[in-house]
Amino acid sequence: MIIMIFSRSHTVFAITAAAALALSACSSSASSSSSASSSQASASPMKVMASFYPLQYLTQKIGGDLVDVESLTPPGAEPHDLELSNQKVQQLSQAGAVVYLKGFQSAVDKAVELNAPKTVIDVSSSVDLVDAEKHESELDVADDGEKTEEAHEHEHEHGSTDPHFWLDPTRMASAATQIGDALAQADPANAETYKKNAASTKSQMEALSKKLVDGTAKCKHKEFVTSHEAFGYLADRTGLTQLGLSGLDPDSTPSPARLKQISDAVKAKGITTIFTEELLSPKVAETLAKDLGITTAVLDPIESQADDSKDYEAVMNENLEALQKALSCE
């Protein structure tokens, strides 16, 4: 009897030990699985919302695989007219960061004010915005065209500055540095990568700026006509002069007086091309060009980008080629 009890005790002990080992193995497996999930979660890219394409471009180049960047302005849409759905506002509030230009899009300004994520990057502090009046052409007339109610609203939104800084790659370089520093602060574990990529992007933008300046240094003509005056920063950088059919806001309609001034300038200066834009109706420009016996071509302000095969730098190079052809550059 004692032997039987002794054997049973050993049997119970063995079963108990086996169970303990099994539980330990399960616990270890669960712990490993939990650690793997935690590691995978920590490796997930940071969600970043950019207000429009040029800022999306910079942020993606700087963040690389560490970020998942989405533009609040849909591809092919006019950013001046942006309205945000409740879903987009919610996505913004849940993002790791937002990159925007304060004063350019009132819907974004309001969303950031009311639903800001932890990291807010306002590039207006680094890109040296210029007073709008400095980028008005010499042809601006008193009535500045017949503006729609919507155009007046946009004019109020933009305030007294020209928002189109991204058409000067040197200013894009400054924005790259700011974005890199902000992302590094938001994600310290990858700070070195952000700063390295920002420095590389800055160098690329500075090289592009030099290419624009050198490529337009020897041109027969120095004036170019555009649909609206979005190219002031590019003109400043290259020493050229833009003459816009309408002002900074694309919704303003050129007055008869403005069109006459453009016509007179084209004849007097030997201008051969009126530039249109992808996102604006070319009707007025094409009609005027036909009346004057000259051509039209596209000069892209890169406010939005629907063609995934071309990025900011590629479009800027196309803009340079278009200018060189229109201005008879060497």
Predicted regions and their residues:
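Extracytoplasmic metal-acquisition and chelation regions
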Residues: 2-17, 22-330
